Amino acid sequence: MINRLLNNLTSFFTDNRWLFSTNHKDIGTLYLIFGGFSGIIGTIFSMIIRLELAAPGSQILSGNSQLYNVIITAHAFVMIFFFVMPVMIGGFGNWFVPLMIGAPDMAFPRLNNISFWLLPPSLFLLLCSSLVEFGAGTGWTVYPPLSSIVAHSGGSVDLAIFSLHLAGISSLLGAINFITTIFNMRVPGLSMHKLPLFVWSVLITAFLLLFSLPVLAGAITMLLTDRNFNTSFFDPSGGGDPILYQHLFWFFGHPEVYILILPAFGIVSQIIGTFSNKSIFGYIGMVYAMLSIAVLGFIVWAHHMYTVGLDVDTRAYFTAATMMIAVPTGIKIFSWIATLWGGQIVRKTPLLFVIGFLILFTLGGLTGIVLSNAGLDIMLHDTYYVVAHFHYVLSMGAVFAFFAGFYYWFWKISGYTYNEMYGNVHFWLMFIGVNLTFFPMHFVGLAGMPRRIPDYPDNYYYWNILSSFGSIISSVSVIVFFYLIYLAFNNNNTPKLIKLVHSIFAPYINTLSKNLLTFASIKSTSDSSFFKFSKFFIFFMVSLSVLFIFYDSLLCLNDHTNSWKIGFQDPTTPIAYGIIKLHDHILFFLAVILFVVGYLLLSTYKKFYYGSLNNDLPESKRISLFDTLINTYKENLSFNVTNRTYNINHGTTIEIIWTILPAFILLFIAVPSFALLYAMDEIIDPVLTVKVIGHQWYWSYEYSDYSVVYSNRMLDYDSIDRFAAMEMMYKGMGYLKDRSLLSYLYIPMVIPETTIKFDSYMIHEAELNLGDLRLLKTDMPLFLPKNTHIRLLITSSDVLHSWAVPSFGVKVDAVPGRLNQTSLYLKNTGTFYGQCSELCGVNHAFMPIEVYVVNPVYFYNYVYIYFKNFNLI
């Protein structure tokens, strides 16, 4: 078998058809094979991540936090640059764009070849970067100073940068090729408004690549020179600013999200048009919705940076601009549903993946509305809520669309047909697996669990084990997928319709149509196996739900109910109360939208499913709901312009309706969002100022204006009896010695011109006392008074950190060279915990925040006694 494999590899590299090919179909096939290989690597990385997070403590990585950081970095790079982009743009784009526009090939065939062959060495460099010294553990954002020569002194980050450069050049060359091909090589008569929607999506994606990738190239080149040539673009010690890198990166990074999802939109449009036996509803609206998404995608980049210290007006602008993207996205969702309504729905594997895409992408988009609010994002930034959001958009958006397109075009590409039953098994396993993996992440994110950590407090255990179990199901679905391909190529089931694979579209090349691929070869076969399988899975899902509800109800009887917490931590500041109230307000509207989308999909499927295109569809069924609505009010749909009468067709009217309605919903969401945002920015004259400094191992705190605050400003003289009990306690602890506690009440603090400074380290698990919380207990907590206006000044001494306490509603980045500030007004006493939520090296999971909120009557005296005992005063 090994000799056979070596012979195949040798023949591959000596066969000019593949190595030096200029045929767009062969190059597209190479992209698909390369993307599949990269997808396996990325899936393995994701499985390692989920196995490590299956339980608290070290599971499979032996406590190597840097290795965990390297794996999450490689997982993101591989999935984005070497799986989704190659298969969606390079694979399907190369295969079908020339065919859909009637072109003999791409405009620059040799350029097409080199654009592919830049990807394997790029992937090789990325994988090598993981093996050089300790690897590149920077996250896919590669933020400095963590990516600087001080924090990553080896060549790993340099290799990762070179890998990104090669992948970027490959994408730029491909984008130029697609733009030239689509503009110059269409058959005569095929205008831009007659292009298939998949071609439009690839064209818009190519422009996004052309405008965004040079910015990324500039950012990582400046980072490279900072690391190796002593420049200081992002080094605060030399006058640079690490936030500049974030602006440059996200100017590329957010359009990159639409680079990944726009080809998916095109694929979904093709499949829905085919399997509903209808043309796409609102074609022009769909095109301009994609154009609007592309334009808006360039002006919303800073919604990834709400916590870095942007002023309130800037955050308000990016909140509004980000919300606007929901309008064209909603147009596309409802246009797809309108296409299905009134059609002749054929239930095949591609359509199953498309319906799954519609439901799950809608859910991911709605959580994006939540995160677009600068006020809410303060609580959710860099938590697993964000991870859940973008995986619902990508893992269940782009990837589901890829599988839909793969099954849809499989026989057109390979000449073989796949087993429909295994295709359905693949869909259901993947649908269940990805939901079980990512839906619980919303709950741990709301509870404040930081992302990109290899270890977590025990309270997050149950949701994480559920996510890890879901990832195993998803991996099984991938195995089923590759087994399906194996069966397709080894069962000799070539359909009779296909004579020559590479000339399959020849009879259709010059057909002037909005969609050259609306034809389909769907056999009229029995679906009995599918129905049996569907019944089994429905029974399985219902049984699993019943068992889960029963198990959850049993958990309510013991002490572990907090581990299944599905909401925010208990608030203790007015800001935290406001954030939770705003979240509930927004969630109501989003739940209604999700219900409407789900109801429309289910009712459409129930009403218009006919099993096969060969069945006759009663004419009464072809009248859509939207036609009925419009015909009712047809008399009111005309208007005069310059003495001419124009009738608004049903597509335009409906699109106007579902453009205005989402805009009104966004308005209802935006008004309280802006009110909360500006309220959060108000800093009342503080009684106490605390400076917070982040380090890679610990936090430092300074009561910087302690010397000007006197204890008797805040005393409640009716509470003197409490001090008698406190005095006995302190004397028992050896703090007061011979002095009375009451002597501290009536005289100013005896520490004029003194600033209290102390460091706060995590207490390791072996040193914890009974009842202490693992990963959250510190040796020196921060003391803050209740019902007092407090100002926090936050900065960093080395890399980026984030001071985040969920119960306070506070999350502020600690940036070297900057001094960010926020205000606190604490309403409850108690002990509150938080963690650093920014990736800051190997110690990311080991920088807890412990805050004691005490009664102001006791605060100054208690602080003085406590720190005097540790010789800090």
Swiss-Prot record:
<dbReference type="GO" id="GO:0015990">
    <property type="term" value="P:electron transport coupled proton transport"/>
</dbReference>
<feature type="binding site">
    <location>
        <position position="303"/>
    </location>
    <ligand>
        <name>Cu cation B</name>
    </ligand>
</feature>
<feature type="transmembrane region" description="Helical">
    <location>
        <begin position="536"/>
        <end position="556"/>
    </location>
</feature>
<feature type="cross-link" description="1'-histidyl-3'-tyrosine (His-Tyr)">
    <location>
        <begin position="254"/>
        <end position="258"/>
    </location>
</feature>
<feature type="binding site" description="axial binding residue">
    <location>
        <position position="389"/>
    </location>
    <ligand>
        <name>heme a3</name>
    </ligand>
</feature>
<dbReference type="InterPro" id="IPR036257">
    <property type="entry name" value="Cyt_c_oxidase_su2_TM_sf"/>
</dbReference>
<feature type="transmembrane region" description="Helical">
    <location>
        <begin position="390"/>
        <end position="410"/>
    </location>
</feature>
<feature type="binding site">
    <location>
        <position position="254"/>
    </location>
    <ligand>
        <name>Cu cation B</name>
    </ligand>
</feature>
<dbReference type="InterPro" id="IPR014222">
    <property type="entry name" value="Cyt_c_oxidase_su2"/>
</dbReference>
<feature type="transmembrane region" description="Helical">
    <location>
        <begin position="323"/>
        <end position="343"/>
    </location>
</feature>
<dbReference type="InterPro" id="IPR000883">
    <property type="entry name" value="Cyt_C_Oxase_1"/>
</dbReference>
<dbReference type="InterPro" id="IPR023615">
    <property type="entry name" value="Cyt_c_Oxase_su1_BS"/>
</dbReference>
<dbReference type="GO" id="GO:0005743">
    <property type="term" value="C:mitochondrial inner membrane"/>
</dbReference>
<feature type="transmembrane region" description="Helical">
    <location>
        <begin position="29"/>
        <end position="49"/>
    </location>
</feature>
<feature type="binding site">
    <location>
        <position position="382"/>
    </location>
    <ligand>
        <name>Mg(2+)</name>
    </ligand>
</feature>
<feature type="binding site">
    <location>
        <position position="258"/>
    </location>
    <ligand>
        <name>O2</name>
    </ligand>
</feature>
<dbReference type="InterPro" id="IPR001505">
    <property type="entry name" value="Copper_CuA"/>
</dbReference>
<feature type="transmembrane region" description="Helical">
    <location>
        <begin position="845"/>
        <end position="865"/>
    </location>
</feature>
<keyword id="KW-0106">Calcium</keyword>
<keyword id="KW-0999">Mitochondrion inner membrane</keyword>
<feature type="region of interest" description="COX1">
    <location>
        <begin position="1"/>
        <end position="474"/>
    </location>
</feature>
<feature type="transmembrane region" description="Helical">
    <location>
        <begin position="248"/>
        <end position="268"/>
    </location>
</feature>
<feature type="binding site">
    <location>
        <position position="454"/>
    </location>
    <ligand>
        <name>Ca(2+)</name>
    </ligand>
</feature>
<keyword id="KW-0813">Transport</keyword>
<feature type="transmembrane region" description="Helical">
    <location>
        <begin position="91"/>
        <end position="111"/>
    </location>
</feature>
<comment type="pathway">
    <text>Energy metabolism; oxidative phosphorylation.</text>
</comment>
<dbReference type="InterPro" id="IPR008972">
    <property type="entry name" value="Cupredoxin"/>
</dbReference>
<feature type="transmembrane region" description="Helical">
    <location>
        <begin position="114"/>
        <end position="134"/>
    </location>
</feature>
<feature type="transmembrane region" description="Helical">
    <location>
        <begin position="656"/>
        <end position="676"/>
    </location>
</feature>
<feature type="binding site">
    <location>
        <position position="836"/>
    </location>
    <ligand>
        <name>Cu cation A</name>
    </ligand>
</feature>
<dbReference type="InterPro" id="IPR034210">
    <property type="entry name" value="CcO_II_C"/>
</dbReference>
<keyword id="KW-0408">Iron</keyword>
<dbReference type="InterPro" id="IPR011759">
    <property type="entry name" value="Cyt_c_oxidase_su2_TM_dom"/>
</dbReference>
<feature type="binding site" description="axial binding residue">
    <location>
        <position position="75"/>
    </location>
    <ligand>
        <name>Fe(II)-heme a</name>
    </ligand>
</feature>
<feature type="binding site">
    <location>
        <position position="57"/>
    </location>
    <ligand>
        <name>Ca(2+)</name>
    </ligand>
</feature>
<feature type="transmembrane region" description="Helical">
    <location>
        <begin position="280"/>
        <end position="300"/>
    </location>
</feature>
<keyword id="KW-1133">Transmembrane helix</keyword>
<keyword id="KW-0812">Transmembrane</keyword>
<feature type="binding site">
    <location>
        <position position="304"/>
    </location>
    <ligand>
        <name>Cu cation B</name>
    </ligand>
</feature>
<dbReference type="GO" id="GO:0006123">
    <property type="term" value="P:mitochondrial electron transport, cytochrome c to oxygen"/>
</dbReference>
<keyword id="KW-0249">Electron transport</keyword>
<dbReference type="Pfam" id="PF02790">
    <property type="entry name" value="COX2_TM"/>
</dbReference>
